[in-house]
């Protein structure tokens, strides 16, 4: 029996795919748990429209990500940090500070977009921001000693 999967089913397929399964498996498990629906022409048309809509949405998100990347290019953030007599910093610059300062410039990113291994001590650092699938931007963060 041909069915359209409504949700991901391990070892069978991903949501919105058409698969062949045994009649009993479809009726007793997939339909009962609302994991699939019977394959019909109407269901196929609905599936095609859903895929087209998802692709359009993906393209729109990619375009917004490219615009955000253009905004981020050339951005320089400067911070002063306290140090001891041996020029060892008391702490580092964190994700929250960078996200907050970018939002003050009307550039909205989330901390999930920043590299999780980043540790910003005194000096100049290039911070890579992962915006969307394959779309990245780099900002310059300058950290200097507080006077």
UniProtKB/Swiss-Prot annotation:
InterPro entries to which the protein is assigned, alphabetical: Ribosomal_bL9, Ribosomal_bL9/RNase_H1_N, Ribosomal_bL9_bac/chp, Ribosomal_bL9_C, Ribosomal_bL9_C_sf, Ribosomal_bL9_N, Ribosomal_bL9_N_sf
Pfam families in UniProt: Ribosomal_L9_C (PF03948), Ribosomal_L9_N (PF01281)
One CC-aspect GO term: ribosome
Keyword set, alphabetical order: Ribonucleoprotein, Ribosomal protein, RNA-binding, rRNA-binding
GO terms of biological process kind: translation
Disulfide bonds: none
Signal peptide region: none
Domain of life: Bacteria
GO molecular function, one term: rRNA binding
Family as reported in the entry's similarity comment: Belongs to the bacterial ribosomal protein bL9 family.
Role this protein plays: Binds to the 23S rRNA.
UniProt protein name: Large ribosomal subunit protein bL9
